[in-house]
Regions:
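Gly/Trp-centered helix-boundary motif
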Residues: 1-155, 159, 163-164, 289, ...
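Alpha-helical transmembrane segments of integral membrane proteins
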Residues: 125-341
Length: 341
């Protein structure tokens, strides 16, 4: 931390002083890393196979059944008892902790779907026979990636729009405010429902639609910061010296505005994850079969006789959002100079 400026060192000290937010950041980082490595934790393929003095990495490469002594050239099914016996007789395999992928079905269970937690399925199976824990891992990754990308794109658009309005003011600011007022009044959910009847919704399609109608969150903050700083003496001096508007905006004014927007980012990320979860719960989100926390919540509602579905999905969403809220509160305290360490 010695490389940080005194101001940033004080901010970091205030952030660490908020123990709840500080440890929430570490827990969130661990959960994020685990979700990014979902294939190494939950997969229906082994990590490494040693078969007849040859090495195979099924988690990275697709092999055929004939590679393991089978009669067909179709992709190997590593859950097939025959193939597992072949590997056991002529070599060995290293498996991941959870031997089910996002769309794997446990055909070996003796109970109807959704089946309760067991030694094979630690959190049980869903209504389609998928492992709940595996789908939570993959669903968390999709939710986090969606939330991060939505936060990034919408923040960039909001910062640019707010900077232009705040710097130039006048008619540009007036017309910009009126456009934002009209645009923010659009019924986003109904538009998504309408478009879902025309095209098949997907990850990038949903991301584009939500960015299109969700970029206004930071406009007001950035606009107010630019309206405040554009009258400073050093800004007027730069204008008098002939410095270009772009250089003034991005080099001299934007760093001050970014500080004000950083405190909002964890809450925007929280809202982005909630948006995808809500759309999936309503049936207008990711394609059918995609691992999703919202879809798992919907299954919990439709299968009240299987409480592990709703409980697991609810706790996953609640923990994720709570961590982000705690982090956001700590970031807000860190950038508040009136907070004592």
């Amino acid at each position: 931390m010695s490389r940080l400026s005194p101001v940033n060192q004080a901010r970091w000290a205030r952030f660490r002083h908020n123990r709840r937010g500080y440890w929430s950041l570490w827990i969130f980082a661990v959960l994020f890393a685990l979700s990014m490595c979902s294939e190494l934790i939950a997969n229906d393929k082994p990590l490494l196979v040693h078969f007849k003095d040859r090495w195979y990495v099924p988690v990275l490469t697709t092999y055929s059944e004939s590679d393991f002594g089978g009669p067909f050239a179709t992709p190997a099914e590593y859950q097939d008892p025959w193939l597992r016996e072949q590997i056991a007789q002529h070599g060995w395999a290293i498996w991941v902790p959870i031997r089910f992928g996002a769309n794997s079905i446990n055909f070996a269970t003796s109970t109807p779907f959704p089946s309760p937690p067991s030694a094979q399925n630690w959190l049980g199976t869903d209504a389609n026979g998928g492992d709940v824990l595996a789908r939570i891992l993959y669903g968390t990754r999709i939710s986090l990636l969606f939330g991060l990308m939505l936060t990034l794109f919408s923040s960039v658009m909001g910062v640019v729009a707010g900077a232009v309005q705040g710097y130039y003011g006048g008619k540009i600011d007036l017309w910009g405010q009126r456009v934002i007022e009209v645009w923010s009044g659009m019924p986003t959910l109904f538009l998504i429902i309408l478009l879902s009847s025309v095209v098949q919704p997907g990850f990038w399609w949903l991301l584009g639609i939500t960015v299109l109608f969700g970029w206004m969150a930071l406009v007001g903050v950035v606009r107010a910061e630019f309206l405040r700083t554009r009258n400073y003496d050093y800004i007027r001096a730069a204008q008098a010296l002939g410095v270009s508007d772009g250089a003034i905006i991005f080099r001299h004014m934007l760093p001050n505005a970014v500080v004000a927007t950083l405190t909002f980012l964890p809450f925007i990320l929280c809202s982005s994850i909630t948006t995808l979860t809500s759309l999936d719960f309503l049936g207008f989100g990711l394609p059918l079969g995609s691992p999703s926390l919202g879809e798992l919540l919907l299954q919990g509602k439709n299968n009240l006789q299987a409480p592990w579905l709703g409980i697991a999905a609810f706790l996953s969403v609640a923990v994720l959002l709570s961590l982000l809220i705690f982090i956001g509160e700590a970031v807000r305290d860190a950038f508040d100079p009136n907070k004592a360490v």
